[in-house]
Amino acid sequence: AIELYNKPTIKYRVEGFSLFICNAWELMLKSYLIKSKGEKSIYFPDNPERTISLENAISKVFTNKKDPLRLNLEKILELRNISTHFITEEYEMVYVPLFQACILNYNEKMMAFHQVDMTKIIPQNFLTLSVSMKALDEAEIVAKYPEEIATKILTVKGAIDELSFQENDRFSIKIEHFHYLTKDKDKATSFVKIDS
């Protein structure tokens, strides 16, 4: 999921990321359920040939419905479920804070549930996503898309923003860039000059 997302030439990297990260979580959670509750715990009681869904695994492992980690997974799962029918490039700006938190949550739970340190497999600096610097512009979305699609994008963004205001890094990791002008070169992180 991380490798796919960080390739700039791939068009549907947001949708691809959601598919692969959900698959990784599903396998990890089912493995944990087998380890902690036995093999039968990942099968439906009325259909022992069929394994439970990711939604079921999430609710069995993370029982607190208000847990920011669970809310994070549920939002990414919603994206995975609609991304085959509803793809927009603006979703990157909406979901990337959730994706980054999801990666760190996955790393934490792999260690807690399976004693596997993902930073031994993937160097820690590669657990960071390459993100677009472009901000989501509501007026641009309304102008670009039909009303139904624009409303959907802005509604999803509003719901995620509302949950993000709780400032819990298990739900989302806010990515902000601030630029300040200073005359003190020791405080500067980059330099600009006026060229005539």
Feature locations, PLM:
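Generic structural signal for well-ordered, non-transmembrane alpha-helical segments
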Residues: 22, 26, 74, 81, ...
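Long, charge-rich C-terminal accessory regions
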Residues: 127-196
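Short, hydrophobic, well-ordered secondary-structure elements
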Residues: 2, 14-34
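Charged/polar positions within long, soluble alpha-helices
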Residues: 3-6, 29-34, 81, 85-89, ...
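Charged alpha-helical initiation segments
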Residues: 1-17, 43, 126, 131
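Amphipathic, Lys/Arg-enriched alpha-helical patches that create a basic surface
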Residues: 95-146
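A broadly used, surface-exposed interaction patch
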Residues: 31-96
